[in-house]
């Protein structure tokens, strides 16, 4: 995907980012990106643990059955 990028391409991209955001804002931007990535990784790991737990308990759950109570209420 990014195999065609060389060092010069990355240097130009970095220069454009510096021009757009300015040097003083970059540390705050990097901090917020790092926090977002940490939260994302935590959520992914939590979902994996939940998936493993479900597999250990038998996998799927039984679907809910309709008792017909809701259709009786709508007809009144």
Curated annotation (Swiss-Prot):
Residues 62-76 have a biased composition (Polar residues). GO terms for cellular component: TAT protein transport complex. It is found in: Cell membrane. This is Sec-independent protein translocase protein TatA. Residues 44-57 have a biased composition (Basic and acidic residues). The gene is tatA. It comes from the Bacteria. Pfam families: TatA_B_E. Belongs to the TatA/E family. GO terms for biological process: protein transport by the Tat complex. Part of the twin-arginine translocation (Tat) system that transports large folded proteins containing a characteristic twin-arginine motif in their signal peptide across membranes. TatA could form the protein-conducting channel of the Tat system.
């Amino acid at each position: 995907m990014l195999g065609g990028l060389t060092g010069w391409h990355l240097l130009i991209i970095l220069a454009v980012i510096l021009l757009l955001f300015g040097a003083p804002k970059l540390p705050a931007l990097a901090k917020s990106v790092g926090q977002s990535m940490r939260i994302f990784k935590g959520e992914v790991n939590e979902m994996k643990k939940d998936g493993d737990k479900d597999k250990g308990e038998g996998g799927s759950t039984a679907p809910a059955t309709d008792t017909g109570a809701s259709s009786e209420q709508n007809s009144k």
